[in-house]
Amino acid sequence: MKDTAKSTPSEVNEAPRRHTDINPRGWWRQLPRRLHPYILLARFDRPIGWWLLLLPGWWIIPATATGTGRMVELMMLFLIGAVTTRAAGCVINDLWDRRLDQSVERTAGRPLAAGTIGITAAVIFLGVLGLFGLMILVRLPLAAILTGIAALPLVILYPLAKRVTWWPQAVLGLTFSWGVPLGWAAASLQSTPEWPPAALLAIYAGSVAWVFGYDTIYAVQDMADDRTAGVKSSALGLGRHLKTGVSAAYLLAVLGLGSGFWLLLGPGPWLGGLVLMALHLGWQVRHLNIDDPAGALRLFQSNRDAGLMLTAAMVLTHLAG
């Protein structure tokens, strides 16, 4: 008879796999074993996700906050909020995808897919994360609270996109770029701030294009398994035009961010950060190889550095002003 006993978290993640983004010797192994599946479910062991969620908000806050103290306060709140929100989003994603994840090599070791945590426990954990995130959100102005709540449908529905469209990365872009309108609303002390639509929309569109590009690179890791499992992605949708598609997305990102911040700030130190970011994005495209999943993961992760280049320049622009 087939053994149906569930493996422990450590056993699941020590099982040999050709490719996974879970580090079996990560810091989380020093924690009590009963916490391991929760750490992995929330991706607390892989900070790249919350970095990428955080950065669009970190771009807009220095450009719009009144006073350095307010800028620092908001950036810290957004940091805590990004870690919490990303963790909650991962739980939602894995609840939707637990059966699909079993068919994909990179995700088969995730706690819900591997059976190391139950659905009830995951839902309770999600509730705790949601409550903590709400505690952060209510510290912001009313306009920001309403803007944050407006993002919930995107967070909940994103996992469904890969089932119905070849472009789920575009939906992720809309979701992960929500820090732009949220940061804009949070930086205003008024309940109904004035929104310069052209600048806001250009920056948001640029961020969406950036997310689309880097998550298409991320999807390169799973192309073979996704094709077998019937999961859709922009990497599969673009096919042999993948490099061209990523190049176009990154070009649109630079143009959108550049035009938006120019309308908002005019010339300033931020331009240097955008140039460095653009060079980094070009470097990614040059080294992208669809036959190298591990290399694609490294390129994807390098987008934290690309985004921090612009963040540093935005902070300098704020201080110089």
Task: For each feature predicted by the language model, list its residue ranges.
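Membrane-embedded alpha-helical segments that form the functional core of polytopic membrane enzymes
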Residues: 54-96, 106, 127-135, 145-156, ...
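Extended hydrophobic alpha-helices typical of membrane-associated regions
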Residues: 33-36, 255, 262-321
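The first (N-terminal) embedded transmembrane alpha-helix
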Residues: 43-63, 177, 311-313
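Hydrophobic residues within membrane-embedded alpha-helical segments of Major Facilitator Superfamily
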Residues: 52, 59, 84-85, 129-132, ...
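Residue-level signal for inorganic ion chemistry
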Residues: 42, 97, 118, 168, ...
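Cytosolic, membrane-interface loops and tails of multi-pass inner-membrane proteins
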Residues: 2, 11-36, 90-117, 215-239, ...
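Intramembrane alpha-helical segments
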Residues: 36-40, 110-195, 202, 259, ...
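Multi-pass membrane catalytic core of lipid/isoprenoid biosynthesis enzymes
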Residues: 54, 76-82, 98-148, 228-267, ...
